[in-house]
Amino acid sequence: MFFQHSQLQNSDHLLHESMADSNHQSLSPPCANGHRSTISLRDDQGGTFCLICFSNLVSDPRIPTVHVSYALHQLSIAISEPIFLRTLLSSHIHFLVSPLVHALSSIDDAPIAIQIMDMISLLCSVEESSIGEDFVERISDQLSSGALGWSRRQLHMLHCFGVLMSCENININSHIRDKEALVCQLVEGLQLPSEEIRGEILFALYKFSALQFTEQNVDGIEVLSLLCPKLLCLSLEALAKTQRDDVRLNCVALLTILAQQGLLANSHSNSASSMSLDEVDDDPMQTAENVAARPCLNVLFAEAIKGPLLSTDSEVQIKTLDLIFHYISQESTPSKQIQVMVEENVADYIFEILRLSECKDQVVNSCLRVLDLFSLAEHSFRKRLVIGFPSVIRVLHYVGEVPCHPFQIQTLKLISSCISDFPGIASSSQVQEIALVLKKMLERYYSQEMGLFPDAFAIICSVFVSLMKTPSFGETADVLTSLQESLRHSILASLSLPEKDSTQILHAVYLLNEVYVYCTASTSINKTICIELRHCVIDVCTSHLLPWFLSDVNEVNEEATLGIMETFHSILLQNSDIQAKEFAELLVSADWFSFSFGCLGNFCTDNMKQRIYLMLSSLVDILLEQKTGSHIRDALHCLPSDPQDLLFLLGQASSNNQELASCQSAALLIFHTSSIYNDRLADDKLVLASLEQYIILNKTSLICAISDSPALLNLVNLYGLCRSLQNERYQISYSLEAERIIFHLLNEYEWDLGSINIHLESLKWLFQQESISKSLIYQIQKISRNNLIGNEVHNVYGDGRQRSLTYWFAKLISEGDNYAATLLVNLLTQLAEKEEQENDVISILNLMNTIVSIFPTASNNLSMNGIGSVIHRLVSGFSNSSLGTSFRTLLLLVFNILTSVQPAVLMIDESWYAVSIKLLNFLSLRDTAIKQNHEDMVVIGILSLVLYHSSDGALVEASRNIVSNSYLVSAINTVVDVACSKGPALTQCQDETNIGEALAFTLLLYFFSLRSLQIVLAGAVDWQTFFGTSTSLETLPVVCIHCHNLCRLMHFGAPQIKLIASYCLLELLTGLSEQVDIKKEQLQCSSSYLKSMKAVLGGLVFCDDIRVATNSALCLSMILGWEDMEGRTEMLKTSSWYRFIAEEMSVSLAMPCSASSTYVNHHKPAVYLTVAMLRLKNKPVWLRTVFDESCISSMIQNLNGINISREIVILFRELMQAELLNSQQVTKLDRAFQECRKQMHRNGTRDETVEEQVQRKIPSIHDHSEFCNYLVHLMVSNSFGHPSESETYTQKKKQILDEMEQFSELISTREGRVSPIQEETRQMQTERIV
């Protein structure tokens, strides 16, 4: 039986205990039998132990066993005493060997035998004693001689021999006299039927074999080698027959050590015939035929291990699995052994162990180690693996949870092998289960929660690829989701982990490529998820793989580089996909052309060159959208790897060399495509030199190939770009001959600028060349025609973006450093002279409208190049009977130009005056002023813009003609009279008829007329006449709408009419107020007239449109001021409406919710009106009641840096002027304004580009509301009392600070001191000066 070392009793400590003095033990007296005292030992209790008596007792078989047992027990007790033990060891220890061995060999009583073996073991364990070697010698002799025969006594001897060989302090080999005889006797004993004896023999053989190989004892090893064939056969037979786990364990241990030393492999290599003859010689009872009929060793081994594999003892199973592993792995060619074991169903037993193992680590590891070897027999093992597939999946769960599990790789290999060999074996639930486990492994690997072996990472990627090929893979969305997440984790882990290597990246990219192939295949089941998967692949490439690849390309080997490029190429091949287009643009924005040639420099192989040029050709197909990448593919075999070599080829004559011509076409295409994306493959000087050489040497072929316009224009783009960069960066010489040839080709042959992709700088260079003006005019006409039909081509590249040719052409015109504006105006002039090409005129006018809409500043260059004269010529050619689309388009252009042109430009171009007069005359010839059509509305809008520009000193004479035009005076009065006559029905009439549009344009024209009057008729207008009655209209020299009519329109009109009429009234009253102030006049109107106006305006103070409410409050404030000057404010003392307005405002500002600036702005009209009442000489008494101490204190309490506006500061200043603030409130206000000022300085100046007003653009439309809305915007942004939308934060802040400064000056004036704000202002000014 096999014993662990821990089972051995150890008494070494006995010799290390305290011992008495050496003289302590005196000589013992003779024993009762008269034996000498020298062989008698005294114990600590005073007793005497005679060794001869003990020997006679244990050796005599006639002595009762109880006496023997007692003697052994007494000896055991005595030995436990240190002095006794020391005396025994010093003189008499060897006297015990013979009697104990004799007793062990002659006693059948098991308990006595056990006592004897324990005694022997105890004696041998003492380090200072050599008695163990005597026991080994005597027992081995007994076993070698075979004198005892195979009996139960022999069992005790075998067991004792095994125990002795387990003692480490005994030199076993040197005291076994005849190793061959001993081993022969033991091997023969294996044929005995007793399982106990076989177990002890196997244990003894195991210990003997282990000892020989450990000490490398040549004799012992030779004996084992000679007897190994027979030993192997008998051991396997014993293993196959036994049902005892202890016997199995000993046998497996013996076979394992033989297998580890290669003896099993050597035995297997011997031929069956020689083995049989040896056995015949050894055993005459066997014939050669009988031996030959026995099963071969591999089959015997397979049958023998099945029993241990079925054992319920996990230790037996583990040891057996280890035996299988060593048995197979020691073979130089183990395929035959594996084949036999698989055919004998050993794999099925192992899978069953896995199924029942409950994922115990040792069992799982041993099973996986053997199964990994079995997988070498691919053909036979596949079928067995299918049976055990569920068990392997269960193990995968366990392995996937353990970081760097030692058999991680083996498990994954089994999964991969089964799925790849039998794609249909995995059900949808199993596929989902596997995908989820692998996803978690990759996720934890990326997060560094667990480790993965490099091979394990590769197999996981391979398993996913195999899973994608299974029929049930795409049946559930969860599987594809797991794949999507796994893909992302695998790439990120490969790129970001410290231990990244190119091999791992290669496998991750392989998975990425296969996933993309799967999700783009037509056989994919879940189309929606596949689209998401494809997007995921592209996102991973763009967000992670591409940036890493571009930055760390030198760390990637060639194979990984090819794999990454293959994936990128696969995406590009889906050129119909929007994301493929975006990916291509991302590549070129990262200088992919330069990067590709850099890769060719690192890996100059045919595979790399082919991959790069094919990818570049696909990139060109997508970017240029003309399938021109075929030029690169056609010349693939002869293209060089260096851009410098491409330039060299480009500079050669190729008229007689088709292969060279093909290379040159590809080179031109590559340099052209890279250049439009600002990717420089070579120095511009070298490129220009090669291009010039190419042009000069191949001018004949260029002329012959002029039909291939894209190829020519690729050359033009490259040439123009190099020339433009040469002008910008440095001055270098260039070939006049090459330039002449290029200009000749462009002037003499037809080409289309919109048919190719071109760089902005190249386009700009072309339009700077006066020599090709004729050809450029033709190109402009093509651009206009494409723009007219909406067939714009986005083929110009600049500022890192691809835009339409029209857009960049507009930019050229706005910049003005080229002939684009001049050529465009000249083209329109030519068409105007011909007078029969209306469609061409319309296309050019539409193009100009588009240009001005894109870049409003282009209006200035168009005007400076004479567009006004051309427009005047066109307008003069129209009559009422010949109006058409061209006239409407022309009016739109005039409107657009006047919205964006600078007044200074209009001042130097007299043609705009003529245009204005023509349009005014056109309007005067219309039949009616009410039923205005589209042209009438636009003309009125244009006249309004002319009046608007007069405020800045431009078109003053034209404006004077407009405001004094008798037709306009009559038409405006007619429209207003009709509208006012409707009364309350005006709103309904506006919805049902065109009176609303006519009235809106009429009021807008009137507003800009009022603003222009002080410029064009300075001092000649009596503003008092605007208070007159309607009967005096014909006596007025200018356009006029009386105040009461404006009030009617404000009261009854629609929201837009209310708004425009309110601005007209505000403008009118402002002019009147200035006249009254300057001339110190009195109002020439009755009190009832003003009362009716105040009734309307007072009601509109609470209008929903804050602009109308503000205008009404401002108008009402001016009227109250006039009345106050004449002492007509008695009605305020009793007016409950004005008091209600003031109370509503004060209560609202005193509420805590007024902290919002929006809420304060809502009450701005009431603030204006309240300020006006506070400024009256005869203030209403109730103001003091409204603004009592508690109300004002609450208002001050609510002030903060957000809601303090210019109006709020004015309000409190007027309250202080009216003595409604006490000193404490003034102090609090002063402190609040100081905090607000500090906060403004802390915030600094905001980015004024955020505040910058974007120029409004009028597209080519026929909706009157667009024109009207623009004019309303223009009116609102330039009206009194309303800050312009272009007003910056800094300007608004300055207004508030100025009002605070005035408030502080008022405080200092009243108190005779310098305010803190004034002092702070002085300090800041001093700091700025310093």
UniProtKB/Swiss-Prot annotation:
Keyword Hydrolase attributed: yes
GO BP terms: meiotic DNA double-strand break formation
Cell compartment(s), UniProt: Nucleus
InterPro entries in UniProt: ARM-type_fold, PRD1
Deleted gene: phenotype: Plants exhibit reduced fertility and meiotic defects. Drastic decrease in chiasma formation at metaphase I associated with an absence of synapsis in prophase, due to the inability to make double-strand breaks (DSB).
Chief location of this protein within or outside the cell: nucleus
Ranges for region Disordered: 1310-1330
Cellular component, GO annotation: nucleus
Keyword terms: DNA-binding, Hydrolase, Meiosis, Nucleus
An MF annotation (GO) of this entry: DNA binding
Domain comment (free text): The N-terminal domain (1-802) but not the C-terminal domain (755-1330) is essential for interaction with SPO11-1.
Name of the featured protein: Protein PUTATIVE RECOMBINATION INITIATION DEFECT 1
